[in-house]
């Protein structure tokens, strides 16, 4: 596997340091005597999450190679691109402007390991049996949605490539940017699948999938987008079962609406939300991450199980937590053994507003710390964070004006 990205490292260390300072053990809870609300906001430049090239949408039409799609074939011009029957192959670094409509054409990116390939979608409609665009080798692929254009990609239910079971597939680091629109229909399984990192820095997205809308392994960072997602399984997902230090997600300045058959927004590693509007209209679990840190934004969730779930069966309990520093979180859960906010580790609320609708509020295995912000359960303001599970982890976290209770019983929280 490639060397792991550093983009999430600084924030993960900072967040863990904050939580460690607030809760040193699973047998005690703490509460500040101050009424001040603490707000922690990640650097707005988001330099630790994105590179300058992630934002660069510029290209020179005069020097770029071109691919013009037409029916079951294409015509090409320029260096580094060739067509054979219904397959277009891009073999080296450069800029390639794609336009036209096709049915049965696949664009393959098979460049050198140090080659950066820039693809510009300029009013493209592609349907194919397997992935419409498949990047199997390159240094980095940058895909720009040309300003004002609408582009559509689809595979088929007969997609026979199990490793590239998506309409758009990348085995290498992928960036999507621009101010155009991308419609994606994942008919076999996933909408967009990336084996390593996926950074998105703009655009409008309409994604449907019979599996996951986004399926990423190591890192998924999204900013400045508008997305409408309808997935039979997970909506926005990054997951790596082999390494708990990756599987990370960062979200800022987006408007994302998700309808999902399973998790709405899922990270096996650290999930950070800085700003934006996120609506999970239907899900089994709304937000899930090894750790979940909300610094801002407006988040609305409906789920049939836990609304927010901090968990990872492969991680240490000290790595698992839910922290709310700012923003607005509204969670409604279905009937049964459900919790609006569930953490297999600690819960810390330093600021923001949490509104929960359900039979209970919090379920946690570690400790609860409440230093600022407002918490409501079924319309009633709460003065402390109370564990809903009998024999659960640490005792309640007191309100910003009060004191935490004594240590609770042995851990026994709902997974």
PLM features: residue spans?
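A composition-driven surface/loop motif
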Residues: 2-415
């Amino acid at each position: 596997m490639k060397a792991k990205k550093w983009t999430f490292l600084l924030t993960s260390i900072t967040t863990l340091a904050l939580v460690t300072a607030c809760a040193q053990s699973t047998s005690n809870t703490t509460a500040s005597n101050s009424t001040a609300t603490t707000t922690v906001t990640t650097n707005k430049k988001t330099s630790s999450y994105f590179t300058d090239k992630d934002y660069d949408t510029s290209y020179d039409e005069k020097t770029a190679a071109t691919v013009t799609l037409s029916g079951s074939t294409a015509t090409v011009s320029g260096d580094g691109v060739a067509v054979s029957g219904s397959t277009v192959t891009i073999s080296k670094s450069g800029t390639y402007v794609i336009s036209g409509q096709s049915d049965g054409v696949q664009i393959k990116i098979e460049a050198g390991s140090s080659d950066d390939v820039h693809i510009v979608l300029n009013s493209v409609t592609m349907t194919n049996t397997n992935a419409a665009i498949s990047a199997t080798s390159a240094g980095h692929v940058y895909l720009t949605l040309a300003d004002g254009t609408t582009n559509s990609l689809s595979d088929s239910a007969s997609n026979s490539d199990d490793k590239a079971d998506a309409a758009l597939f990348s085995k290498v680091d992928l960036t999507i940017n621009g101010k155009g629109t991308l419609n994606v229909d994942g008919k076999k399984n996933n909408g967009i699948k990336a084996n390593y990192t996926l950074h998105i820095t703009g655009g409008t997205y309409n994604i449907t999938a019979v599996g996951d809308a986004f399926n990423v392994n190591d890192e998924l960072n999204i900013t400045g987008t508008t997305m409408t997602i309808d997935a039979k399984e997970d909506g926005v997902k990054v997951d790596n079962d082999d390494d708990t230090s990756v599987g990370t997600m960062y979200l800022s300045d987006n408007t994302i609406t998700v309808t999902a058959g399973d998790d709405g927004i899922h990270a096996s590693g650290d999930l950070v939300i800085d700003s934006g509007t996120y609506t999970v209209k239907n899900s089994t679990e709304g937000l899930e991450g090894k750790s979940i840190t909300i610094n801002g934004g407006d988040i609305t969730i409906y789920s049939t199980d836990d609304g927010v779930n901090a968990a990872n069966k492969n991680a240490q309990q000290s790595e698992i937590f839910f922290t709310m520093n700012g923003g607005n979180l509204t969670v409604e859960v279905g009937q049964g053994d459900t919790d609006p906010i569930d953490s297999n580790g600690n819960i810390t609320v330093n600021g923001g507003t949490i509104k929960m609708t359900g039979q209970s509020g919090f379920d946690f295995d570690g400790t609860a710390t409440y230093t600022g912000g407002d918490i409501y359960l079924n319309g009633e303001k709460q003065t402390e964070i109370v564990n809903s599970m009998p024999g659960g982890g640490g005792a309640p976290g007191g309100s910003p004006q009060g004191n935490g209770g004594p240590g609770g019983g042995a851990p026994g929280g709902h997974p």
